[in-house]
Amino acid sequence: MGDYVTPGEEPPQPGIYRSEQMCLAQLYLQSDASYQCVAELGELGLVQFRDLNPDVSSFQRKYVNEVRRCDEMERKLRYLEREIKKDQIPMLDTGENPDAPLPREMIDLEATFEKLENELREVNKNEETLKKNFSELTELKHILRKTQTFFEEVDHDRWRILEGGSGRRGRSTEREETRPLIDIGDMDDDSAARMSAQAAMLRLGFVAGVIQRERLPAFERLLWRACRGNVFLRTSEIDDVLNDTVTGDPVNKCVFIIFFQGDHLKTKVKKICEGFRATLYPCPDTPQERREMSIGVMTRIEDLKTVLGQTQDHRHRVLVAASKNVRMWLTKVRKIKSIYHTLNLFNIDVTQKCLIAEVWCPIAELDRIKMALKRGTDESGSQVPSILNRMETNEAPPTYNKTNKFTKGFQNIVDAYGIATYREINPAPYTMISFPFLFAVMFGDMGHGAIMLLAALFFILKEKQLEAARIKDEIFQTFFGGRYVIFLMGAFSIYTGFMYNDVFSKSINTFGSSWQNTIPESVIDYYLDDEKRSESQLILPPETAFDGNPYPIGVDPVWNLAEGNKLSFLNSMKMKMSVLFGIAQMTFGVLLSYQNFIYFKSDLDIKYMFIPQMIFLSSIFIYLCIQILSKWLFFGAVGGTVLGYKYPGSNCAPSLLIGLINMFMMKSRNAGFVDDSGETYPQCYLSTWYPGQATIEIILVVLALVQVPIMLFAKPYFLYRRDKQQSRYSTLTAESNQHQSVRADINQDDAEVVHAPEQTPKPSGHGHGHGDGPLEMGDVMVYQAIHTIEFVLGCVSHTASYLRLWALSLAHAQLSDVLWTMVFRNAFVLDGYTGAIATYILFFIFGSLSVFILVLMEGLSAFLHALRLHWVEFQSKFYGGLGYEFAPFSFEKILAEEREAEENL
């Protein structure tokens, strides 16, 4: 660690600790081999192509026609897919990953898809026509049946019509405009009237048809008002549900027949029928003709049923055959399309025989990339090998962190804050341990942790089946994607629950308590006899009740019974523990920043950032941790001599919070806990508790304060001085030094010696505000001031922020205790069958509330708090997060994104 190493020369490091080393390479492909080479790179998924034609629109690129052909094939396949889903035919998806077809195979695929689409469209068109004819014939069948009844009723009512009465649907009033259809009131002779009536009936016209049931009331009203009552309307509902002849949707319809007189009314009635989208059908006048037509209609219906069944069978066979290959075809087409999209990123040389690309790729995978190019060249039959040349560049490479299904969830947690700057320390491997651990500190309960662990185990053991099921629910996908994170959170929660000795708010006496009951039974009985006395608290003095040996692992179960001071003890322990964990993680973050400074050869950052930060952190916060541990180790309940001072007992245990305040205020305090006469000082817990404490603390405070101006001004000053020296050196070199160079003419065989000023390359900077270009001192000072203030204030605020570990742990334990006391414990006070039934019922209530409130809600809360502690308190000490993600050309990724987009539609 003491030797500087440049990027690319450092010792091999697993990719999980830093992002993979990347290089920019230039790729030369023969036109004939370019398609196959890109296909092989897509299968490999380790190359990110750069767009060398950023100013060229998508419609002006070389392979735009091929992309359009792929779009058209994809459209046809989506049409086939929709038709297959419409018939509820399962599509075969074996998970097979076919190779990308050759360019010449596109013609065969296009022909296959064109044939399938045309055949299916023709079958659909024929089926639609047949269904329309079938619906029309079905409606005509119902019309012929119903109109026969109508005509029979009209024959009985003829004389009523002739006398001015209306039919069942006709309406008459005494108004002038509502006269009867035929007025023969002036005829006195019965025979003459009969003959005139028969002649009039011969002049009556009628139309018959069907109309949707919900339109019938409005249809009747408009007919009555438009025709002034001079029509005779009869309707009857069709019991069967018919398909609409236009849309094909199932609808309820009614048969109607309208009688009228004259061409004017006929025209008006037809227009009204057309307006209400009623369908009119021809209907013969005589019963014999209607009977013959009905027989013909029934015959045609039966024939249509046969033809329609055959058409549907043929359509089904076509779709079943297509369903076996449609997923594979989609995969092939999408691969072809992605290849041509990638080829559009290439430059084409002037000879049109070579394609040039620039790619980002991992240095460790160059051999595999070259092998893929060789396979592509061999498969294409090209005699010219493909060339991959590494390039020098000042551009920041993309960040590529290798992951697997276990580490992916933790890497996503880190990347959600920001993609790591190229080659800086990756927090993910440390997050794998610290994240579930800090979560468990807040969530610690063996019972709830076991529930979480079992749920995660289910997702892990059934992951293949669950992946194959392709469940689209977003909440499920969130839990399933983080199954390994949940698994570790559950495992660590069981561990911290064991440390807290907490199982559903209860403790387990595994090793035997270190406390003994020293209270006589007579005293206990005395307190239990009287209700008021029973509310008093019995105290176990540690001098007599504690055997001096701590509980082997975790918290002594006796504290679960200590109603009076249980919270005081646990709060003090968890509060100090939170501070220890927080300062330890922050210190580790600062140490990781040293690794970054070493890697990037930033000596100024090491001298004037890392070292002052460690001194500042150690002078105050690490010193506080030492005090916490010392208090736990040396200051017990029993008095004695501690660190050279006489210690009277627990009442003189030092107060660390007030002591820290006095340290900054440099307040004078008593040395030790007792005076020379052996009397205990009043407020002895405020005294100094080891020799030389006051002097040491003054030195630490001064040392911490001195680091602030060092962090603020030292680095900008040395950057400024370095910049001045480089500027002076460049000026002197430009004025005094010249060098000779050779200018050659490629069209002639001679050359000349010329003189030109030497160009001094600018140093590459490794810090903020320096490097290429002039140094802007204002920007450097502002940047340095922001980071200094952020670190100094952050050390205080972040330490306080870690107290959320204590707060959430307390809240979780108290909520668990309330749930046990208020719900499940009530079942234990009942005896017999009533108690058994109550226990059965209350257990399910208790279990449901535990899962939904304590596991899910409290678990989500602890998860978010752990997320904040890592993003802000931990990663702010060393993590830049200013990089961009490596996005390789990968068929697997492209197909997965397409599948996800389909499922979200």
Swiss-Prot record:
Membrane topology annotation: Multi-pass membrane protein
Keywords: Hydrogen ion transport, Ion transport, Membrane, Transmembrane, Transmembrane helix, Transport
Lineage of source species: Eukaryota, Metazoa, Ecdysozoa, Nematoda, Chromadorea
Family, as annotated: Belongs to the V-ATPase 116 kDa subunit family.
Quaternary structure and partners: V-ATPase is a heteromultimeric enzyme made up of two complexes: the ATP-hydrolytic V1 complex and the proton translocation V0 complex. The V1 complex consists of three catalytic AB heterodimers that form a heterohexamer, three peripheral stalks each consisting of EG heterodimers, one central rotor including subunits D and F, and the regulatory subunits C and H. The proton translocation complex V0 consists of the proton transport subunit a, a ring of proteolipid subunits c9c'', rotary subunit d, subunits e and f, and the accessory subunits vah-19/Ac45 and vah-20/PRR.
Subcellular locations according to the entry: Membrane
GO BP annotations, alphabetical order: defense response to Gram-positive bacterium; embryo development ending in birth or egg hatching; locomotion; negative regulation of locomotion; nematode larval development; positive regulation of neurotransmitter secretion; positive regulation of programmed cell death; proton motive force-driven ATP synthesis
Molecular function per GO: ATPase binding; proton-transporting ATPase activity, rotational mechanism
Function: Subunit of the V0 complex of vacuolar(H+)-ATPase (V-ATPase), a multisubunit enzyme composed of a peripheral complex (V1) that hydrolyzes ATP and a membrane integral complex (V0) that translocates protons. V-ATPase is responsible for acidifying and maintaining the pH of intracellular compartments and in some cell types, is targeted to the plasma membrane, where it is responsible for acidifying the extracellular environment. Required for assembly and activity of the vacuolar ATPase. Regulates the size of gut granules during embryonic development.
One GO term describing the cellular component: vacuolar proton-transporting V-type ATPase, V0 domain
Protein name: V-type proton ATPase 116 kDa subunit a 1
Species of origin: Caenorhabditis elegans
Residues that span the membrane, as ranges: 425-443, 446-462, 478-507, 573-592, 611-631, 700-719, 789-813, 835-873
Tissue: Ubiquitous expression in embryos. Expressed in gonads, intestine, neurons in the head and motoneurons in the ventral cord of larvae and adults. Expressed in the vulvae and spermathecal uterine valves. Weakly expressed in the pharynx.
